Curated annotation (Swiss-Prot):
Protein name: Small ribosomal subunit protein uS10m
Domain of life, per lineage: Eukaryota
Assigned GO CC terms: mitochondrial small ribosomal subunit; mitochondrion
InterPro entries: Ribosomal_uS10_dom, Ribosomal_uS10_dom_sf, Ribosomal_uS10m
Species the sequence originates in: Caenorhabditis briggsae
Principal subcellular localization: mitochondrion
Compartments in which it is found: Mitochondrion
Amino acid sequence: MLNIANTIRSTLLRSKTRNVRTLAATVNPAEQQQVQAVLPDKLYSSIEIEYRGHDKAVLKSYTTFLQQVCKHLEIPQGRLEVLPYIRWVQPALRSKFVHKKYKLHYETRTHITKLEILNVTGSTASTFLEYIERNIPEGVGMRVGFTELQPLPLTIQN
């Protein structure tokens, strides 16, 4: 048995072409359309987009870009909220070990902006989010939150 397996393996490795069998589709296109199930699209009451960056001007230009995208795709836009920045301060010594009176002061400010999109279907939301994620500027981070609409369970409806 082991000898047969070794001979099969050696013949497969020696041959330059591999024999692969594929099954041709024998289903008519009309029947194929019936097979595909129609799933209902998700509905979102709101999508909250939060984006952060260190440059205030970059966030402002990205905000105008998002507003223009909403206008052209006819997506209803909710509130635009500019949150206060987060300040991070780190004092450090100039020297490695001594000279405590010579210090450096490192500071970063993270500016935060939130934009809300209202009443969107799942396909529109995925297209919109893919487009804005492809065009996000360098140094800007994004966080997206969804609020999905779902029907009540049958136990509550009755």
